[in-house]
Structure formats: structure tokens, C-alpha cells
């Protein structure tokens, strides 16, 4: 264990919109917070900047010497280009130094006088701006696999970033209807089914490595993945146990199965009433947690068990018009009309359940800064059990595999941490 050390700012540079000037702000950033989330299509970075008036040489007409501050030189008035390279104590880097990576999204001025001012800025992915342009809206009709439609959306943004996508089983059709490209991606994810798994639901998000379009279930599949392991041993011990990558400095469980909320959202059992406009018939279908457990990839061995009183009882009723006949698939035939793989309504309801199940158990942990981690990664956490035994062992309930839903790298001039919001759908260590 190397001990806690600050993140090294290899590059923090902001560029003027008015000329070719740029300012290196590495020496004036007391706080930097870098964030990713599996629920966000773009990255955000919040920086506090101490502007001491030394950003650039002053260009006085009378030839007098001196310097001026960041706000006087660059002004930070709009969507300035921003470049960033970060490195942690292990040599892991986040490199967002291309011209097309980042833009200043928001500026707030905290305090100011003639000698010093404090500025708080939010930097976002350039695509957050590109997504708002009318010229980039989705206007055509799109037919194909979900991952192909997501590719089309990113082409509309003209992004140069990579896409890491799971192939979808079902062909779907969407009309553009002037959707924002990110809006199209978020709509498509709800009705996509991965190849080989009968469980709907994808996520679309950005990390420092690029864009991701992943199946919820395949995200929890451990096959072929490098999974970092962290252990909580208490503040008294600074040692990391053999076989672990780091120490959990702090943990807090935010929600351990909010069952009432799950009932209200129909996560365990939903009744779907489908009206077929072609034959004027009403069909009733039940989507329950048994189907979820049978078809889904879970993080642990033990899924929540309901009492006999409420088991297999529906808690949410949805009335929908069956989408039969509403899609023209030139590669399919008439027999495809009643194929459940093409039933967008049922698929969207199933994904609705899957999202709520996968995020049902949530906790926060803090570790030493580790820039190799990204939103969507799996980590293994070992927590001590609560007991009065002579020797404390790992908790068989709380320990196990979790997915990083949200990530924040936090750095000051003296120390740095990574905060992780972790989620999963079940308990225990999977055998």
C-alpha cells in the first residue's frame, strides 16, 4: 500500500474563444471532482480555481509590466475548450486532451477583489453541447439492432470517441421525430434484448474511455473480466490483506432493498393488460420476479425472498396497446408479427423491472484514488460481519460483487480519494 497521495495534474488547460491564448491552471486548483455515471451520457468535472491575477502577461498600451488573471484573459464567458490529463499514484491516467473532448459548461464566481478571485467551473464532454444542436437531431426512420441505432445517434453527434456495445437480439424501428441523439439512445436502451439472454434492458453512458451501450445482465457477468477487490478492515489497520487491491476507508449502505418502493414500482410482479387493435381482444400477462431470477444474471446467490402473503401477487397494473402491426421489417415475414421478441411493450415493461431489480441494493464506499476504475465496472468488496464472535470473519450477506453506478475522483493538493456508489440485486458471494 503506497498511502494516500494526491492526483497529479499533468494537464489542466483552458483556451480562449477570442484568440489563441490558453492558460495552465494546474497551480490554482484546490479541489477537483471528476464524475461518471451509468445513468449519464456525458462526463462532468467540477473545479475550484484560485485566480491570483497571474494567468497571462498584461498587454498595457503604455508598456507597463504586470500580469492579469484568468477571468481578465480567457474570460470564461461561454463554451471554452478544455484539456485535462490526470495521473494517480499507481500510474493510471485519464487523458482527455483532444480538441474534441471537453468544454466549459458552467461558471460561478464565488468571491472577488483586486488581488484574488475564486471561480468554480463545471467542465463537460463536448458532446453535451453537440447534442443540443438542431442540425444533429435524429430525423430519419431507423430500423435494426439497438446497438446499430445507437451508432447512428453517435454519428449524428459527429463524435470521434469509441463505442463499446453489446449486440442486441431484436430488430427495432424508431422514427427520429427530431429527437436529441442522447434521447434516442436512452429510448432504444429500454427496448433492447441482449443476444443469448431473455432479459431486456441496456444502459448508455460515457466514461473516459468512450461510450458504452451494455446489457444490464452482461454487465454483471464476471466472465473474462478483471475485477478489483477491496476490503474493509477498520481505521486502526492500514494493511491491505493479500489478494486485495485496496482498502475501503469508509462505507455506508444507502438502501438495503427498499421493498415498499419496489412494490410500488412493480419490481416483483406486474400485471400487463394488452389490447390488440387488430382482433379487438384484451390479453392479460404477468411478469414476475420468478421470470427475472430465471433469465437474469445476478451479482450474488441469494435474491430477496418475499413472505408467502405477498409472493406472486401483482402490485402494478399497466394498460397498453399491443404494438402488433406497427412495425415494418423488410427482413421479416408475417409470422414475426406475433413473435414476443418484437413486442416492444412487453420488452419495455420487462426492462422496467430489470432496472429496479439491479439497483435495489446500494452502498457508498471511499477508497484511495484509483483512476483505472470506470462507471459500469465490477468490483468485489469484503465487509466484516456484525457479530460478537472471538474472530470476526467476512459478512456472507454484504460481501460480494457490486457494479459501479456512480464514480467521483476527488483531489486536493495533499490527498485524493475515489468515491463509488455501488449497486447490485442480490446478497452474498456468488459461488
For each feature predicted by the language model, list its residue ranges:
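Assembly/oligomerization scaffold segments
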Residues: 1-130
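Envelope-exposed proteins and targeting segments
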Residues: 8-10, 41-43, 80, 98-100, ...
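Second-shell loop/turn segments in exported
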Residues: 133-143, 170-176
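Sec-exported extracytoplasmic/periplasmic mature domains
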Residues: 154-159, 189-194, 381
Amino acid at each position: 500500500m503506497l498511502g494516500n497521495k494526491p492526483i497529479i495534474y499533468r494537464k489542466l488547460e483552458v483556451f480562449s474563444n477570442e484568440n489563441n491564448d490558453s492558460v495552465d491552471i494546474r497551480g490554482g486548483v484546490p479541489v477537483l471532482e471528476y464524475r461518471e455515471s451509468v445513468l449519464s451520457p456525458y462526463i462532468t468535472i467540477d473545479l475550484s480555481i484560485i485566480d491570483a491575477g497571474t494567468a497571462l502577461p498584461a498587454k498595457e498600451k503604455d508598456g507597463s509590466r504586470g500580469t492579469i488573471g484568468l477571468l481578465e484573459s480567457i474570460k470564461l464567458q461561454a463554451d471554452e475548450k478544455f484539456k485535462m490529463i490526470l495521473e494517480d499514484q499507481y500510474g493510471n491516467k485519464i487523458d482527455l486532451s483532444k480538441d474534441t473532448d471537453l468544454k466549459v459548461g458552467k461558471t460561478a464566481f464565488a468571491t472577488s477583489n483586486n488581488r484574488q478571485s475564486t471561480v468554480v467551473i463545471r467542465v463537460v464532454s463536448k458532446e453535451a453541447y453537440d447534442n443540443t444542436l438542431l442540425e444533429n437531431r435524429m430525423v430519419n426512420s431507423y430500423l435494426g439492432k439497438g446497438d446499430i441505432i445507437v451508432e447512428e445517434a453517435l454519428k449524428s453527434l459527429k463524435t470521434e470517441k469509441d463505442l463499446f456495445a453489446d449486440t442486441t437480439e431484436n430488430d427495432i424501428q424508431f422514427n427520429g421525430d427530431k429527437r436529441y441523439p442522447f434521447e434516442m439512445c436512452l429510448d432504444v436502451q429500454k427496448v433492447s434484448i441482449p443476444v443469448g439472454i431473455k432479459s431486456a434492458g441496456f444502459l448508455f453512458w460515457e466514461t473516459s474511455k468512450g461510450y458504452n451501450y451494455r446489457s444490464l445482465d452482461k454487465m454483471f457477468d464476471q466472465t473474462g473480466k478483471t475485477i478489483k477487490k477491496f476490503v474493509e478492515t477498520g481505521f486502526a489497520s492500514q494493511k491491505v490483506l493479500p489478494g486485495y487491491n485496496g482498502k475501503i476507508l469508509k462505507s455506508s449502505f444507502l438502501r438495503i432493498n427498499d421493498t415498499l418502493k419496489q412494490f410500488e414500482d412493480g419490481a416483483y410482479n406486474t400485471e400487463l393488460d394488452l389490447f390488440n387493435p387488430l382482433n379487438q381482444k384484451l390479453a392479460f400477462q404477468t411478469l414476475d420476479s420468478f421470470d427475472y431470477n430465471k433469465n437474469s444474471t445476478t451479482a450474488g446467490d441469494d435474491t430477496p425472498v418475499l413472505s408467502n402473503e405477498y409472493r406472486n401477487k401483482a402490485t402494478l397494473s399497466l394498460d397498453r396497446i399491443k404494438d402488433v402491426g406497427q412495425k415494418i421489417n423488410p427482413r421479416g415475414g408475417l409470422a414475426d408479427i406475433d413473435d414476443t421478441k418484437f413486442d416492444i411493450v412487453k420488452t419495455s415493461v420487462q426492462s422496467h423491472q430489470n432496472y429496479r431489480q439491479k439497483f435495489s441494493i446500494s452502498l457508498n464506499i471511499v477508497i484511495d484514488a484509483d483512476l483505472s476504475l470506470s462507471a459500469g465496472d465490477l468490483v468485489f468488496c469484503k465487509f466484516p460481519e456484525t457479530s460478537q464472535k472471538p474472530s470476526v470473519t467476512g459478512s456472507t450477506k454484504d460481501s460480494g460483487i457490486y457494479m459501479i453506478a456512480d464514480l467521483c475522483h476527488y483531489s486536493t493538493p495533499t490527498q485524493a480519494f475515489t468515491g463509488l456508489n455501488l449497486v447490485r440485486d442480490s446478497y452474498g458471494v456468488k459461488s
